[in-house]
Structures are given as structure tokens and as C-alpha cells.
Regions:
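Acidic/glycine-rich C-terminal interaction modules and beta/coil loop segments
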Residues: 1-107
């Protein structure tokens, strides 16, 4: 299927894609399994942004990215999950795929 996306939600010249949320690691900010996530493709984000990230080539995950001086923190928004702190060479294995721009719920 497809999701109609109003042009005002998009910046021209940038690439976007939709993902369907899996898991419950971001429920405290209202992202639940089955929700649709509009992601703007980009390989870097600001500290505090919610992004699609893969580590060590693993499946992509949606987490809040917090940048520290010598570390990168992947913070879930559910206290049942632990944050992942990456330091040193571990940070080289992190690949940001894009930034969350919009959440759409389907009932």
C-alpha cells in the first residue's frame, strides 16, 4: 500500500521514507507498534533527535540519539529498556539512516 503525504510535510530536494514501528521501546513518547513513521534520509542528526539507527549492521532501530563529548547514547523512551552507550571505536559502527519527521497512527 501507500500513504498519502501532504507536500507541506516534505522539504523539496530531500528524500523520505515510511517505516512501520515494531516493538515498544518508544511508547513513552507515543510511538507504538504499528504506527507509521515518516523518516527524512540523513546520515547525521542533532543531539536529542529521534532517529533510525543501525549498529554493527544489525537491524535498524528507532531511538533518541544523545551526543556526548566522547560517546553516543541511544536512548529508548520506555523504562523497561536500557540505554546503549557507545564509546571509542564502537561509535564507528553506528550508522544513522534518518530522522523522525512525523508520526501517523492508523486505527
Amino acid at each position: 500500500g501507500y500513504i498519502e503525504t501532504p507536500l507541506e510535510d516534505l522539504n523539496s530536494g530531500e528524500e523520505y521514507f515510511w517505516l512501520r514501528a515494531k516493538g515498544d521501546s518508544m511508547t513513552n513518547i507515543g510511538i507504538h507498534p504499528g504506527d507509521f513513521l515518516l523518516i527524512r534520509k540523513q546520515n547525521d542528526v542533532d543531539s536529542g533527535d529521534i532517529a533510525v539507527v543501525s549498529v554493527n549492521g544489525d537491524d535498524a532501530t528507532l531511538k533518541r540519539v544523545i551526543k556526548k563529548e566522547n560517546a553516543l547514547v541511544l536512548q529508548p523512551e520506555n523504562p523497561a529498556y536500557e540505554m546503549k552507550i557507545l564509546v571509542g571505536k564502537e561509535m564507528e559502527d553506528v550508522h544513522i539512516r534518518g530522522r523522525l519527521m512525523k508520526l501517523e497512527k492508523r486505527f
